[in-house]
A protein has these predicted regions:
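Small-residue-enriched hydrophobic alpha-helices in membranes
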Residues: 1-143
Length: 143
C-alpha cells in the first residue's frame, strides 16, 4: 500500500476523491479486474462511511460527469485523486487516449504543471517495475 495522506483529508474531500476515481473506472467504457482491484484498494484508504460507500458504488454503475467530480475537489485531494487515477488507468498495462484525455483535464482543472500527467505516468511505470522486481525476487527465493 502507498504511504498516504488520503485518510487525513476531511470526510467531504475523501468522498469527492472517491467519486473522481469512480468516474475514471468508466472513462474508456471498460472496467478491468486490475482497475477494479486498484479502485477497491484506494476506496478502502478513503475511509468513507457506509452510506458514502453505497453512493460511490452507485457511481460505478452510473458515473457522474467529470465536471461534477471536479466541482468540489480541493487542491490536495485533487493531486491525490490524479495520482491514483493514473495508477488505476495504468493498472491494466496501458493508458488509452480517453483515459489520458481525462487525466489531462483533471490536471488542467487543478492548474498543475503542463507535464504533470506525463511525470505521473513515468513514476507509475517505475513503481510497477519495482513491484514486478519484488515478485520476481520472491519467485527466485524458492528452492
Amino acid at each position: 500500500m502507498l504511504p498516504d495522506t488520503v485518510h487525513k483529508l476531511p470526510q467531504s474531500e475523501r468522498f469527492v476523491y472517491a467519486r473522481l476515481l469512480a468516474y475514471m473506472t468508466r472513462v474508456d467504457n471498460e472496467l478491468t479486474v486490475e482497475e477494479m482491484a486498484m479502485f477497491e484498494q484506494r476506496l478502502g484508504t478513503a475511509l468513507l462511511s457506509p452510506k458514502q460507500r453505497q453512493m460511490i458504488r452507485a457511481d460505478l454503475k452510473n458515473p457522474p460527469s467529470l465536471e461534477e467530480c471536479l466541482a468540489d475537489l480541493g487542491d490536495e485531494a485533487g493531486r491525490l485523486a490524479l495520482r491514483d487515477a493514473v495508477l488505476m488507468a495504468a493498472s491494466d498495462g496501458s493508458v488509452d487516449e480517453d483515459e489520458k484525455e481525462a487525466l489531462e483535464d483533471i490536471a488542467d482543472h487543478l492548474d498543475l504543471a503542463p507535464d504533470a500527467v506525463k511525470r505521473l505516468l513515468a513514476w507509475t511505470v517505475e513503481g510497477y517495475a519495482w513491484m514486478q522486481a519484488g515478485y520476481d525476487l520472491l519467485n527466485d527465493l524458492s528452492r
